[in-house]
Amino acid sequence: MKISDRFPALASRDFTIFWVGQFISLTGTWMQNTTQPFLAYRLTGSPFVLGLIGFSATLPTLLLALPGGVLVEHLDKRKTVIVMQVIMMVQAFLLAFLALSGLIRIWHIILLAFLLGTANAIEITARQAMLIELVGKPALPNAIALQSTIFNLARVLGPSLTGVVLLLVQNQGEGWAFFANGVSFLFVIGGLFFVRTPYANTNHSASLASTNIPRELNEGWRYIRGNTLILLIIIMAAWMGFFGYPFPQQIPAVASNVLHQASDTDKIVQARNSLLYLSMGVGALVAALFVSAFSHLRRKGLLMMIGEFAFAAVLVLVAFTRNIPFMLVLIGVLGWSMVSQMMMMNTLIQLDVPDSLRGRVYSVYLWAVQGVAPFGSLFIGWLAQAAGVPEAALVGGSLCLLALVFIHIKWPILRQNIS
């Protein structure tokens, strides 16, 4: 059996070029994702500041995801992704300069997180909509799964490389991790110049000048209201995005405080922080590989449900855990469950929505997940600061569990889709 038989998206030269370049870039991104919150916690010692950075990074999604979804449908998606990737590269190099020069302050991190979030709010929608233009609809589920695979493989490699850099470079490891992220963007940007989109709708730019954003957004909302399955997926995504998904932002506080040992040094805490991110990445990678290899499975709703309930239950268990090895296992399962449910949500939406509405509907889904996240980040950060990190995990996990039970009992269409 050829690789392209199991992974049909790899039969596309254009997708493969983009896929490889993005993998290198995502590895750098996860080096920054591991380093930035740890640096912020080292500067302030505040769980609330971790939530504030999450708020700053995700607020642009609340503001831009919906109009961005309309605009993306009228723009060249490949060129849009290139522009946003360049902005993200500049952000990484600015962070590197500030950290290496010793000028870094917490307000720099918050402001640059907002800049990164602004680019991400548009780039994610454009990139997801570009996938079908690279591979066509038959190979789309596999392309989505392969995208998630490299994202989560990068979640493993990024923290591992970060740990090595922080151990080897005594005083400026964070700055060099940011610099490596900036360099990594060159690979995906360069690759995109060699990529073509053979399945693209060439009429996307014809009506850009006459685009009526409120009217077109309303068309997307009408479709969602008339499709109960898509509506429920978006509602669940929003609830989890507020009470559950922001918790991993507290990993530096877990590494430093919840798992504190009498023999701790800065290097030990740094290594523990990287290990927790690594564990989450391994769990996420396992989920992505499974879904990639078996993207043809019909019962996608079942895996979504298992991932949702596992995520909420594990979050509750995290609240009662002080053992380092067991915490590593739980964080790994947290990564697996989070990726499983989000990949299935993404796939169900991409397959169920017509081409003409995909950008708008996906932007609503993205808004549901990340648009509410700024306030979820503040809530979880405030709760962790006021009551404790374990208490924040307990409240978030319990509320997610209660909502999932209610939704699955109240709306039988979910059970019908799962079976």
Task: Give residue ranges: language-model regions.
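Small-residue-rich segments within alpha-helical transmembrane domains of MFS-like 12-TM solute carriers
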Residues: 30, 117-125, 241, 245, ...
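Intracellular juxtamembrane helix-capping segments at the cytosolic ends
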Residues: 36, 122-135, 340-353
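Helix-loop boundary and gating motifs at the non-cytosolic
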Residues: 2-62, 222-280
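Cytoplasmic helix-loop-helix junction between adjacent transmembrane helices
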Residues: 112-153
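Helix-loop junctions on the cytosolic side of multi-pass membrane transporters
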Residues: 129, 133, 178-209, 408-419
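Transmembrane alpha-helix termini and helix-breaking/packing motifs in multi-pass membrane transporters
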Residues: 38-43, 96-101, 157-180, 257-261, ...
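C-terminal transmembrane bundle of multi-pass solute transporters/carriers
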Residues: 51-53, 63-67, 74, 80, ...
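Helix-breaking motifs and short loop linkers at transmembrane-helix boundaries and internal kinks
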Residues: 44, 76, 98-99, 103, ...
